[in-house]
A protein has these predicted regions:
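Hydrophobic alpha-helical transmembrane segments of multi-pass membrane transport/permease proteins
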Residues: 6-30, 51-60, 168-174
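Hydrophobic/aromatic residues in alpha-helical transmembrane segments
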Residues: 60-64, 112, 147-148, 227-228
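Terminal transmembrane helical anchor/hairpin motif
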Residues: 28-43, 162-231
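Secretory targeting signals
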Residues: 22-26, 42-45, 51, 55, ...
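Membrane-embedded or membrane-proximal helical elements that form or frame transporter/channel pores
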Residues: 30-64
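Short helix-to-coil transition segments within interhelical loops
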Residues: 79-87
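Transmembrane helix boundary and interhelical loop/hinge segments in multi-pass membrane proteins
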Residues: 61-79, 95
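A short amphipathic helical element positioned immediately N-terminal to and/or at the very start
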Residues: 1-4
């Protein structure tokens, strides 16, 4: 995680994330209070807004593009792979470092909400579940996207290519969320709804816990980390 804080990209991400989330927070707070809207909470509005998802889709590829691509470019991957470190340990360390920094990026949003909770108390209209569960879903989605970013970064030594391919793959998977609006019904609609990040976030932001997305995202994250480990194992054998 230390490597993130010596990179200017990290501070750009932190600044942009804080700025966009802060602006979104202020906008929705004013909008909901002025129009006296009670149908959804402040956190629901923020976490279902366009800029929330745009920021999430863009920041993860930028966050993970250096993970292995830079090691390939600098030639340090050979030294790492010949060290007494197993591939899964390397993948896990990169993954946990990225997840920790990802959490730091979104921490200001939690702080904004904490301040409002202190000032307004229960009049804010949000239970503990409505506050904790959306951030849990955000973390799960972030972990899944990060695992994709690490996998793509392990395939190339060009950081820009890693970022572009990661974004393309993440966006493709995210686009499945919009299939539900094509008028599909029956079991197909139910399956798409189960795979939809938008529906999952909406459910959790209402304070409703559903174990299915947790299992799905956890399994998908493990799958991409497993693929990354196999890529590194193949590179070790090739050396």
């Amino acid at each position: 995680m230390k490597s993130y804080f010596v990179s200017p990209v990290a501070y750009i991400l932190l600044f942009s994330c804080s700025l966009i989330n802060g602006a979104s927070f202020v906008f929705w707070l004013n909008y909901l209070s002025i129009n006296n809207i009670k149908e959804f909470t402040l956190l629901q509005a923020c976490m279902n807004a366009f800029f929330f998802w745009f920021l999430l889709l863009v920041q993860v590829p930028v966050l993970t593009m250096r993970s292995f691509a830079e090691e390939y470019k600098l030639g340090t991957i050979e030294m790492i792979l010949t060290a007494p470190v197993r591939e899964w340990e390397l993948v896990l360390s990169k993954f946990l470092g990225s997840v920790c920094f990802f959490s730091v990026l979104w921490m200001p949003m939690a702080l904004y909400l904490a301040v409002l909770r202190i000032v307004y108390g229960h009049s804010l209209g949000m239970s503990a579940g409505m506050i904790v569960l959306p951030f849990l879903m955000l973390l799960l989605i972030g972990m899944f996207f990060i695992s994709i970013g690490l996998f793509v970064s392990s395939l190339t030594k060009n950081q820009i290519i890693a970022a572009i391919l990661s974004f393309a793959l993440i966006f493709l998977i995210f686009s499945l969320s919009f299939l539900i609006y094509l008028g599909i019904g029956g079991q197909t609609r139910e399956m798409i709804s189960y795979l939809s990040f938008l529906d999952q976030m909406d459910t959790f932001s209402r304070g409703i816990f559903d174990s299915r997305p947790v299992v799905l995202l956890g399994s998908a994250t493990f799958f991409f980390l497993f693929l990354t480990e196999k890529i590194l194992e193949w590179r070790r054998l090739r050396e």
